[in-house]
Amino acid sequence: MTTAFDAAHTEGPGFVGIRFCQECNNMLYPKEDKENKILLYACRNCDYKQEADSNCIYVNKIMHEIDELTHIVPDVISDPTLPRTEDHACPKCSHREAVFFQAQTRRAEEEMRLYYVCTNQNCTHRWTE
C-alpha cells in the first residue's frame, strides 16, 4: 500500500527513504538474501519481507563546497605537485607567484573554477577569478 506521504517522499535523485512493514507498521531494515543474492527489506517484529527496488540503502550528500575559500588549506603552497604561475599577482600583497588548482563547485552544471593561493609565507591569501 503506497500512501501520499510515500509518493511525495520517494522521488528525486539519490533518495533513499524509510520503509514500513505492511503487516505491523514497524520499520523495515535492509537485509541480504544470500541464497538469491538480492537485497530485501525485512521487519524485525514479524516475518514480512519485500524485495528492494534499488541496491542503494544509504546516501551521504556532502554539502560542503570548495567555493568556500576558507576551507582551502594554506599549506598547499608547499605542495610540489601543484602548478605555479606568475601571471596572477596576489590581490592582497601583490606577490607575483601563486599555486593554483581547478575544482568543480557543488552544482554540476557550473563550470570548473581556478583557485589561487599566494606563495608568500606571510600572506597565503586565497582567491578565485
Curated annotation (Swiss-Prot):
Main location: nucleus
Compartmental location: Nucleus, Nucleolus
Binding-site positions, Zn(2+) 1: 21, 24, 43, 46
SUPFAM superfamilies: Zinc beta-ribbon
GO molecular function: DNA-directed RNA polymerase activity; nucleic acid binding; zinc ion binding
Annotated SMART domains: RPOL9, ZnF_C2C2
Binding site for Zn(2+) 2: 90, 93, 118, 123
GO biological process: maintenance of transcriptional fidelity during transcription elongation by RNA polymerase II; mitotic cell cycle; transcription by RNA polymerase II; transcription initiation at RNA polymerase II promoter; transcription-coupled nucleotide-excision repair
Keywords: DNA-directed RNA polymerase, Metal-binding, Nucleus, Transcription, Zinc, Zinc-finger
One Pfam family cited in the UniProt record for this chain: Zn_ribbon_RPB9
Zn finger limits (TFIIS-type): 86-128
Signal peptide boundaries: none
Gene Ontology cellular component list: nucleolus; nucleus; RNA polymerase II, core complex
Zinc finger (C4-type) boundaries: 21-46
Subunit organization: Component of the RNA polymerase II (Pol II) complex consisting of 12 subunits.
Family: Belongs to the archaeal RpoM/eukaryotic RPA12/RPB9/RPC11 RNA polymerase family.
Function according to Swiss-Prot or TrEMBL: DNA-dependent RNA polymerase catalyzes the transcription of DNA into RNA using the four ribonucleoside triphosphates as substrates. Component of RNA polymerase II which synthesizes mRNA precursors and many functional non-coding RNAs. Pol II is the central component of the basal RNA polymerase II transcription machinery. It is composed of mobile elements that move relative to each other. RPB9 is part of the upper jaw surrounding the central large cleft and thought to grab the incoming DNA template.
Protein known as: DNA-directed RNA polymerase II subunit RPB9
The organism's taxonomic lineage, starting at the top: Eukaryota, Metazoa, Ecdysozoa, Arthropoda, Hexapoda
